[in-house]
């Protein structure tokens, strides 16, 4: 009888332990740019420069950059995930020099970013992969004083 109770206790304990989610599978608290999403958008807007040729012809597009927000909030491993540039008509823009300039500009901005507030799992700071889209859609050069 005593042996059966021990086995029951062990089985219940085992089942309850395996039902606990493992830390690291999902992030309870995503990393945040200091000041929040609005501050991130302003940071990008104030620092992003479109290639002049792209502005002249009215092309627009998007570059998606991924990076890792480390436990201390620093940014590492920035890389371009996807680039889409188009003419106003919707036709794909295929000038590889301009595409490369847009990608380099997006990476430059990521490398300029201040430390983020790190993501947390189970109350502990963790490394988190993050994606940010950079929109290149200005139709005219923007003055630094224009808002």
Predicted regions and their residues:
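Charge-biased low-complexity segments
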Residues: 2-11, 15, 19-147
